[in-house]
Amino acid sequence: MDIKKIPVGKNPPQDVNVIIEIPLLADPVKYEVDKESGAMFVDRFLHTAMHYPCNYGFVPHTLSDDGDPVDVMVVGRIPVAVGSVMRTRPVGVLYMEDEAGRDEKILGVPHSKLYPYHDNVNNFGDLRPIELRRIEHFFAHYKDLEEGKWVKILGWGNYKEAWDVIERGIAAEAAHKKV
């Protein structure tokens, strides 16, 4: 896969592409796409016996404060193959902090052209509360057994905050490419 040829999305930040690194309900393995080669690498095995509560990946051509592309959790009912590009509507952002600093994860739903199941979801609060609690629980505890690692959930932000995170990520990547 040549990530350089995959656009940010049809109408960013409201409609973005997400390259899936980890499918919904995946085994406890953290995968990451190498941005240069496009190859999928095993980043690490999670020490906790937990499964990902959503399809998980990143928006191409973005750069977040942690030096990686903007992370995205895509809720759904169907696991998506690793390396797939999924058209996504951002509906919120989960603010977190870990041993490396502040970390933001966009919450999205599949675009209605892919799957109309979430057409009524425009903001994170439109999802069932149990869905949000499952996501929070996973990210609050998935590093629990890893030496020196920790996570603190800071709270949720709305879709406009998610759009802002994506816009900042696009601008940061553009500035980084100029250097």
Swiss-Prot record:
GO process annotations (BP):
phosphate-containing compound metabolic process
Q: Which cofactors? A: Mg(2+)
Q: Identify the residues that bind Mg(2+) 2.
A: 71
Name the reaction it catalyses.
diphosphate + H2O = 2 phosphate + H(+)
Kindly list the positions annotated as binding substrate.
30, 44, 56, 142
Query: Enzyme group, top EC level?
Result: hydrolase
- Annotated compartments: Cytoplasm
User: Which keywords does UniProt give here?
Assistant: Cytoplasm, Hydrolase, Magnesium, Metal-binding
CDD domains per UniProt:
pyrophosphatase
Q: Which GO terms describe its cellular component?
A: cytoplasm
Name a GO molecular-function annotation: magnesium ion binding
Binding positions (Mg(2+) 1): 66, 71, 103
Q: What is its EC number?
A: 3.6.1.1
Task: Check the record and name the InterPro entries matching this protein.
Answer: Pyrophosphatase, Pyrophosphatase_sf
One family name in Pfam for this protein:
Pyrophosphatase
What PANTHER family does the database record attribute to this sequence? INORGANIC PYROPHOSPHATASE
The family database entries (HAMAP family) matched by this protein are listed as: Inorganic_PPase (MF_00209)
Q: What does the record note on quaternary structure?
A: Homohexamer.
Role played: Catalyzes the hydrolysis of inorganic pyrophosphate (PPi) forming two phosphate ions.
* Protein family per UniProt: Belongs to the PPase family.
The name this protein goes by in its record: Inorganic pyrophosphatase
UniProt organism field:
Rhodospirillum rubrum (strain ATCC 11170 / ATH 1.1.1 / DSM 467 / LMG 4362 / NCIMB 8255 / S1)
